[in-house]
């Protein structure tokens, strides 16, 4: 009897997971699977996901000044002028579908500048915990989400954080370029990775 109950619970768990993945894949015509195994989630699909539950979107910062020949915005530890333009373009596209979100960044010049240009005036909260890229980042995300359970969250962080999350949550190899992102959500105290954000 106990074995049957355990088997039944496992079956239900896998069924729920499969339903969730199917829902993500079927939410929009642009949704597909990346070569790294992550579902691709565009703006429209993200907006539909956000209707089901608040989403947490983590972006890598824009183009670094110290690793580019392009003109710097200001501080050499920050981003380039091209990076500001790219961040603003991404922010405009994102806000067209999801305008209501809380904005956070790690405490580096490049993430703060990226978030500022992305948001076009929205209040930015800097949180040094978002620079930590082990399990600590999950605790930070859950804490931020608990402060406003019904709000979407946008976080500007770093490539090694995104790489860690993709590997840890889905065993996927994710090497994000500038302003690439991941889509997550928090449910019953656990952080789930929904897929890779694709700006179309």
Curated annotation (Swiss-Prot):
Q: What class of enzyme is it?
A: hydrolase
Protein name per Swiss-Prot or TrEMBL: Lipopolysaccharide core heptose(II)-phosphate phosphatase
Q: Which family does it belong to?
A: Belongs to the phosphoglycerate mutase family. Ais subfamily.
Which Gene Ontology biological process is one annotated for this entry? lipopolysaccharide metabolic process
Q: In which pathway does it act?
A: Bacterial outer membrane biogenesis; lipopolysaccharide metabolism
Instruction: Reply yes or no: does the keyword Hydrolase apply.
Output: yes
Function statement: Catalyzes the dephosphorylation of heptose(II) of the outer membrane lipopolysaccharide core.
Query: Any idea of its EC number?
Result: 3.1.3.-
Name of the coding gene: ais
Q: What is its main location?
A: periplasm
Q: Where in the cell is it found?
A: Periplasm
NCBIfam families from the UniProt entry: PRK15416.1
Task: From the UniProt annotation, give the residues forming the signal peptide.
Answer: 1-25
Q: Which GO terms describe its cellular component?
A: periplasmic space
GO terms for MF: phosphatase activity
Ordered alphabetically, the record's keywords are: Hydrolase, Periplasm, Signal
Biological source species: Shigella flexneri
């Amino acid at each position: 009897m106990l074995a049957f109950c355990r088997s039944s619970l496992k079956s239900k768990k896998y069924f729920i997971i499969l339903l969730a993945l199917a829902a993500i894949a079927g939410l929009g015509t642009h949704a597909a699977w990346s070569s790294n195994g992550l579902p691709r989630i565009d703006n429209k699909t993200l907006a539909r996901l956000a209707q089901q539950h608040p989403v947490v979107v983590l972006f890598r910062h824009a183009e670094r000044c110290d690793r580019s020949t392009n003109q710097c915005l200001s501080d050499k530890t920050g981003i380039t002028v091209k990076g500001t333009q790219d961040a603003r373009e991404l922010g405009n596209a994102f806000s067209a579908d999801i305008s209501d979100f809380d904005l956070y960044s790690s405490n580096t010049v490049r993430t703060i500048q990226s978030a500022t240009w992305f948001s076009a005036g929205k209040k930015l909260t800097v949180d040094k915990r978002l620079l930590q890229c082990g399990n600590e980042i999950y605790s930070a995300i859950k804490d931020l989400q608990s402060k406003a359970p019904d709000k979407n969250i946008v976080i500007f962080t770093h490539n090694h954080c995104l790489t860690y999350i993709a590997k840890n949550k889905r065993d996927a190899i994710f090497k994000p370029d500038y302003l690439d992102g991941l889509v997550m959500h928090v449910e019953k105290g656990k952080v789930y990775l929904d897929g890779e954000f694709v700006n179309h």
